């Protein structure tokens, strides 16, 4: 296993750590005994996990460590991190105010991309959808939005959230189009023909 893949796995392992610390912080808020040390710890863990996305990509390119495992784990780690943070911020007592439209677009994109990848893999046998620059931009912008939300920097968060949502929506449409083209090329979308007379 490559160093880049190990960094990606480390990012995945940080997700439950973040969730645990974040939930304890939310509990302290609910009990009117807010522990800002937990909030800071959660933000630090989230920041490390987010930055590791750039690190594993750089390591993979710099040391020629691109692999099929890394190509699967890296976007999966990003999606799991985004969904986990959204879940904590939306369904706990964290004092944040994420725009509903940002949450809907972010969750829809991540869920559809995961489900779409499994569907294409099931129907076609392999997924050959290349990352688009809009998707590469939407992920760090979404992570930055979530980080600013946890820092309660709402004025800075809003324009970043708008950009993140535009790129997320655009990349989602592009990936759906590319997936459909791949399914069409395989002939899996055609209904079976009936018996001939």
Predicted ranges, named:
Residues 1-197:
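Alpha-helical transmembrane bundles and membrane-interface segments of multipass inner-membrane proteins
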């Amino acid at each position: 296993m490559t160093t880049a893949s190990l960094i990606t796995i480390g990012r995945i392992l940080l997700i439950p750590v973040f969730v645990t610390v974040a939930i304890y912080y939310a509990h302290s808020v609910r009990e009117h005994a807010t522990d800002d040390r937990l909030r800071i710890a959660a933000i630090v863990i989230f920041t490390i996990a987010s930055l590791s996305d750039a690190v594993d990509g750089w390591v993979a390119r710099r040391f020629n460590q691109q692999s099929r495992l890394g190509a699967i784990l890296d976007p999966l780690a990003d999606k799991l991190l985004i969904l986990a943070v959204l879940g904590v911020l939306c369904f706990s007592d964290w004092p944040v105010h994420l725009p509903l439209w940002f949450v809907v677009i972010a969750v829809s994109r991540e869920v559809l991309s995961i489900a779409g990848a499994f569907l294409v893999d099931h129907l076609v046998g392999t997924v050959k959808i290349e990352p688009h620059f809009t998707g590469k931009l939407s992920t760090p912008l979404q992570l930055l939005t979530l980080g600013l939300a946890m820092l309660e920097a709402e004025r800075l968060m809003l324009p970043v959230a708008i950009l993140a949502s535009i790129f997320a929506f655009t990349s989602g449409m592009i990936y759906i189009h590319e997936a459909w083209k791949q399914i069409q090329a395989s002939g899996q979308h055609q209904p079976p023909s009936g018996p001939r007379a």
